[in-house]
Amino acid sequence: MVEILLSGIVLGLIPITILGLLMAAYFQYQRSKAAS
């Protein structure tokens, strides 16, 4: 039961983490492009 709960949490967090990293990289790219 605990394993199922943990795997569900991990599977839910992975896409959110990837999305957050992509958004952070995108905003950083937009800022550097606007600054130059």
UniProtKB/Swiss-Prot annotation:
The 4 large subunits of the cytochrome b6-f complex are cytochrome b6, subunit IV (17 kDa polypeptide, PetD), cytochrome f and the Rieske protein, while the 4 small subunits are PetG, PetL, PetM and PetN. The complex functions as a dimer. Belongs to the PetG family. Component of the cytochrome b6-f complex, which mediates electron transfer between photosystem II (PSII) and photosystem I (PSI), cyclic electron flow around PSI, and state transitions. PetG is required for either the stability or assembly of the cytochrome b6-f complex. The keyword Nuclease does not apply. GO terms for cellular component: chloroplast thylakoid membrane; cytochrome b6f complex. One of its GO terms (molecular function) is electron transporter, transferring electrons within cytochrome b6/f complex of photosystem II activity. The keyword Transmembrane applies. It comes from the Eukaryota. GO terms for biological process: cytochrome complex assembly; photosynthesis. It is found in: Plastid, Chloroplast thylakoid membrane. The chain crosses the membrane at residues 5-25. Keywords: Chloroplast, Electron transport, Membrane, Photosynthesis, Plastid, Thylakoid, Transmembrane, Transmembrane helix, Transport. It is a single-pass membrane protein. Its main location: plastid. This is Cytochrome b6-f complex subunit 5. SUPFAM superfamilies: PetG subunit of the cytochrome b6f complex. InterPro entries: Cyt_6/f_cplx_su5, Cyt_6/f_cplx_su5_sf.
